[in-house]
Protein backbone atom coordinates (compact mmCIF):
# COMPACT_ATOMS: atom_id res chain seq x y z
CA UNK A 1 0.00 0.00 0.00
CA UNK A 2 1.43 3.36 -1.01
CA UNK A 3 1.51 6.37 1.28
CA UNK A 4 -1.25 8.03 -0.76
CA UNK A 5 -3.45 4.93 -0.45
CA UNK A 6 -2.83 4.83 3.31
CA UNK A 7 -3.85 8.46 3.67
CA UNK A 8 -6.97 7.87 1.60
CA UNK A 9 -7.90 4.82 3.70
CA UNK A 10 -7.39 6.80 6.91
CA UNK A 11 -9.71 9.55 5.68
CA UNK A 12 -12.34 7.02 4.61
CA UNK A 13 -12.16 5.20 7.95
CA UNK A 14 -12.48 8.49 9.82
CA UNK A 15 -15.57 9.38 7.79
CA UNK A 16 -17.08 5.92 8.39
CA UNK A 17 -16.47 6.30 12.12
CA UNK A 18 -18.06 9.76 12.15
CA UNK A 19 -21.10 8.49 10.24
CA UNK A 20 -21.50 5.53 12.61
CA UNK A 21 -21.31 7.86 15.62
CA UNK A 22 -23.84 10.22 14.07
CA UNK A 23 -26.23 7.33 13.39
CA UNK A 24 -25.80 6.01 16.94
CA UNK A 25 -26.67 9.42 18.37
CA UNK A 26 -29.73 9.73 16.15
CA UNK A 27 -30.93 6.24 17.17
CA UNK A 28 -30.59 7.09 20.86
CA UNK A 29 -32.42 10.40 20.45
CA UNK A 30 -35.23 8.69 18.55
CA UNK A 31 -35.46 5.85 21.11
CA UNK A 32 -35.94 8.45 23.86
CA UNK A 33 -38.50 10.44 21.83
CA UNK A 34 -36.25 13.47 21.43
CA UNK A 35 -37.32 15.16 18.18
CA UNK A 36 -33.91 16.52 17.26
CA UNK A 37 -31.50 15.98 14.39
CA UNK A 38 -27.78 15.48 14.89
CA UNK A 39 -27.18 18.93 13.42
CA UNK A 40 -29.61 20.51 15.88
CA UNK A 41 -27.80 18.70 18.68
CA UNK A 42 -24.50 20.24 17.56
CA UNK A 43 -25.97 23.74 17.84
CA UNK A 44 -27.74 23.04 21.13
CA UNK A 45 -24.60 21.53 22.63
CA UNK A 46 -22.67 24.71 21.82
CA UNK A 47 -25.40 26.79 23.46
CA UNK A 48 -25.55 24.54 26.52
CA UNK A 49 -21.86 25.30 26.97
CA UNK A 50 -22.16 29.03 26.28
CA UNK A 51 -25.22 30.92 25.17
CA UNK A 52 -25.55 34.46 23.91
CA UNK A 53 -23.14 33.86 21.06
CA UNK A 54 -23.38 35.12 17.51
CA UNK A 55 -24.47 33.07 14.54
CA UNK A 56 -20.98 33.54 13.12
CA UNK A 57 -19.43 32.01 16.22
CA UNK A 58 -21.92 29.13 16.11
CA UNK A 59 -21.12 28.57 12.44
CA UNK A 60 -17.42 28.28 13.25
CA UNK A 61 -17.97 25.98 16.24
CA UNK A 62 -20.27 23.63 14.32
CA UNK A 63 -18.51 23.87 10.93
CA UNK A 64 -21.79 24.88 9.28
CA UNK A 65 -22.20 27.44 6.53
CA UNK A 66 -24.30 30.51 7.23
CA UNK A 67 -27.35 29.37 5.23
CA UNK A 68 -27.43 25.95 6.88
CA UNK A 69 -27.04 27.44 10.34
CA UNK A 70 -29.81 29.98 9.71
CA UNK A 71 -32.13 27.13 8.76
CA UNK A 72 -31.14 25.16 11.87
CA UNK A 73 -31.73 28.15 14.15
CA UNK A 74 -35.11 28.78 12.48
CA UNK A 75 -36.10 25.19 13.25
CA UNK A 76 -34.82 25.45 16.83
CA UNK A 77 -36.87 28.63 17.27
CA UNK A 78 -39.99 26.83 15.98
CA UNK A 79 -39.44 24.21 18.68
CA UNK A 80 -39.10 27.08 21.19
CA UNK A 81 -35.61 25.91 22.24
CA UNK A 82 -33.71 29.06 21.22
CA UNK A 83 -34.36 32.75 20.68
CA UNK A 84 -32.48 35.40 18.74
CA UNK A 85 -31.81 38.72 20.46
CA UNK A 86 -30.18 41.90 19.24
CA UNK A 87 -26.56 42.36 20.23
CA UNK A 88 -25.92 45.19 22.70
CA UNK A 89 -23.41 47.00 20.48
CA UNK A 90 -24.87 46.21 17.04
CA UNK A 91 -28.59 45.64 16.49
CA UNK A 92 -27.85 43.77 13.25
CA UNK A 93 -25.74 41.22 15.11
CA UNK A 94 -28.19 38.66 16.48
CA UNK A 95 -27.12 36.62 19.48
CA UNK A 96 -28.55 33.17 20.15
CA UNK A 97 -29.90 32.26 23.59
CA UNK A 98 -31.61 29.22 25.03
CA UNK A 99 -35.22 29.45 26.11
CA UNK A 100 -36.23 27.80 29.40
CA UNK A 101 -37.40 24.81 27.30
CA UNK A 102 -33.98 24.67 25.61
CA UNK A 103 -32.24 24.70 28.98
CA UNK A 104 -34.58 22.00 30.29
CA UNK A 105 -33.88 19.85 27.23
CA UNK A 106 -30.26 19.58 28.35
CA UNK A 107 -31.42 17.62 31.40
CA UNK A 108 -32.74 14.91 29.08
CA UNK A 109 -30.23 14.96 26.24
CA UNK A 110 -26.85 15.49 27.94
CA UNK A 111 -27.02 12.23 29.95
CA UNK A 112 -27.94 10.33 26.77
CA UNK A 113 -24.92 11.73 24.93
CA UNK A 114 -22.64 11.10 27.91
CA UNK A 115 -23.80 7.46 27.90
CA UNK A 116 -22.91 7.15 24.21
CA UNK A 117 -19.41 8.50 24.89
CA UNK A 118 -18.99 6.16 27.85
CA UNK A 119 -20.16 3.16 25.84
CA UNK A 120 -17.92 4.08 22.91
CA UNK A 121 -14.93 4.44 25.22
CA UNK A 122 -15.66 1.10 26.90
CA UNK A 123 -15.76 -0.66 23.52
CA UNK A 124 -12.36 0.66 22.48
Where are these regions (language model features)?
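N-terminal positioning helix adjacent to the helix-turn-helix/winged-helix DNA-binding module
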Residues: 6, 10, 36-40, 101
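Short alpha-helical "packing" element that flanks the helix-turn-helix/winged-helix DNA-binding module
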Residues: 43-44
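Short capping segments at the starts of secondary-structure elements
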Residues: 50-54
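Residues within helix-turn-helix
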Residues: 55-56, 67, 74, 94
Amino acid sequence: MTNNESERELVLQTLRTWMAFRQAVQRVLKRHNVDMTFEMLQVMNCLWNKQGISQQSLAEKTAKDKACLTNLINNLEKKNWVIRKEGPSDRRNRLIFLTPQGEELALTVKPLINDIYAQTGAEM
